[in-house]
């Protein structure tokens, strides 16, 4: 099916709900913060709980799943073949303890419902069908580490004090069992141990602290409790079956112990099958589960990657089958935006192969929703050079929405009515970077050297900006040479 596959009159999208898995090495991903992308159904924007206000970054702006579906042609024109959306599940809309909202999707209250701001299950299915009808794929962001902030445990004068977030909007505890057992003062709920009853993480370098403490006051799930693991398998497996999701991006991976991942993803237990088993049952034999394991390392250091790579597991006991490439992102900003020596990229590429076995398991990006945009500290030419590098090495390119329209604000809206949009839509298919990214996607498609090649840097600088030249030798004997000036 080509680009003629548009939504039909019923608005249900024209593709199949379930399609076979692609080779992920050949994909280009467009990452959308759904609330800030496009408002396709204005009726769901304001749920009248004081949670909607496009004039502030802290509240909902109105973007939704219908909006993403309506812009599939725009995304496809960039050369993107998959769309990664922020978590669409029912969220805590407003947390009065921190005066901020859950528009971003990472503060769940029910893992098996679509958030009312995002739309309905039917609209989610329509997005899936529309993507599939265009030969594209759907990646859902998931969060097994925590729910929203419905309680706090504060250490006051050496004693743990339990505080309920009673004014949380729209609910003061999750509406889904067993995640609704948030009351530490209730002995039965405390004993159910759905959560780690802990204060905030005090030492991020200490495994036990990181795995069991609350991250930013978010209620930390006890992922070593089989009841929790089975509920997470059921909840997230549901979206593969019900919405035709083709892959997961997994949030906050390093905040969960290693033992969880093999069971959650790969278990063949018929009573509580893992995600991969559930995906296979829908015909997806190459379901992707790539994770965020953000470890700042610094130039010429592989310390961060050693921890990150450990979440791939082993052949006998696999864990995630892809990881976001934070160390390369940091080096790309240093080299292409800050004029540092290009030999740090040469060093990094070699180091990544050593740590991960292959560059193809990595998901590359220049910026994302949790950091300053590349263009906040660099010009368009710098960004173009960084993107050329990213599209001519193995590792799946991920483009954060708005990059193609020269966005500098990390969570600004693409649509006129949304937060910090400047009062206009930003879907210009003639923009310089939109056309440039489309041409890079075509270039990448032209040779397996770019998607599966062995990369050798043969010229780089030891001080300051300058040449970066490398060859990519593909498995089919083709060689591509890329030369750029950083």
Enumerate the language-model features and the residues they cover.
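Substrate-binding/active-site clefts of carbohydrate-active enzymes
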Residues: 21-27, 35-243, 263-268, 273, ...
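Beta-strand elements of modular eukaryotic interaction domains
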Residues: 19-20, 279
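Short, P/G- and charge-enriched loop/turn segments at secondary-structure junctions
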Residues: 16-19, 350-352
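Bacterial Sec-dependent N-terminal signal peptides
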Residues: 1-18
């Amino acid at each position: 099916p080509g680009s003629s596959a548009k939504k039909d009159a019923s608005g249900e999208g024209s593709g199949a709900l379930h399609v076979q898995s692609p080779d992920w090495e050949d994909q280009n991903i467009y990452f959308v913060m759904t609330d800030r992308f496009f408002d396709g159904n204005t009726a769901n924007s304001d749920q009248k709980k004081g949670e909607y206000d496009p004039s502030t970054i802290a509240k909902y702006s109105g973007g939704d799943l219908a909006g993403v579906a309506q812009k599939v042609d725009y995304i496809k024109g960039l050369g993107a073949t998959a769309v990664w959306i922020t978590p669409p599940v029912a969220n805590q809309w407003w947390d009065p303890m921190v005066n901020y909202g859950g528009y971003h999707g990472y503060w769940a209250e029910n893992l098996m419902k679509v958030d009312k701001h995002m739309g309905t299950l039917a609209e989610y299915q329509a997005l899936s069908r529309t993507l599939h009808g265009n030969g594209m794929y759907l990646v859902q962001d998931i969060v097994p580490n925590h729910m929203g902030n419905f309680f706090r445990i504060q250490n006051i004068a050496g004693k743990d004090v339990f505080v309920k977030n009673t004014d949380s909007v729209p609910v003061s505890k999750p509406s889904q069992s067993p995640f609704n057992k948030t009351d530490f003062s209730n002995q039965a709920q405390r004993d159910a141990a759905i959560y780690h009853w802990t204060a905030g993480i005090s030492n991020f370098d200490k495994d036990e602290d990181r795995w069991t403490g609350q991250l930013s006051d978010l209620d930390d799930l006890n992922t070593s409790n089989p009841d929790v693991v089975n509920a997470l398998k059921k909840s997230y497996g549901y979206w593969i079956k019900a919405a035709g999701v083709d892959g997961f991006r997994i949030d906050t991976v390093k905040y969960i112990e290693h033992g969880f991942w093999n069971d959650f993803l790969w278990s063949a237990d018929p009573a509580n099958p893992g995600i991969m088993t559930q995906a296979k049952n829908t015909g997806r034999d190459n379901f992707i589960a790539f994770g965020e394991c953000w470890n700042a390392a610094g130039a010429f250091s592989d310390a961060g990657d050693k921890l990150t790579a450990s979440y791939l597991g082993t052949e006998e006991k696999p864990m995630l089958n892809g990881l976001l490439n934070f160390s390369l992102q940091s080096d790309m900003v240093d080299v292409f935006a800050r004029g540092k020596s290009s030999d740090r990229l040469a060093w990094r590429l070699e180091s990544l192969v050593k740590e991960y076995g292959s560059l193809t398991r990595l998901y590359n990006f220049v910026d994302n929703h949790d950091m300053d945009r590349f263009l906040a500290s660099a010009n368009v030419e710098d960004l173009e050079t960084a993107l050329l590098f990213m599209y001519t090495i193995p590792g799946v390119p991920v483009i954060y929405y708005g990059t193609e329209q020269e966005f500098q604000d990390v969570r600004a809206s693409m649509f006129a009515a949304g937060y910090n949009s400047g009062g206009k839509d930003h879907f210009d298919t003639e923009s310089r970077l939109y056309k440039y990214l489309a041409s890079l996607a075509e270039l990448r498609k032209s040779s397996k050297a770019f998607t599966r090649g062995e990369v050798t840097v043969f010229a780089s600088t030891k001080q300051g900006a300058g040449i970066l030249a490398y060859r990519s030798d593909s498995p089919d004997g083709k060689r591509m040479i890329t030369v750029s000036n950083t």
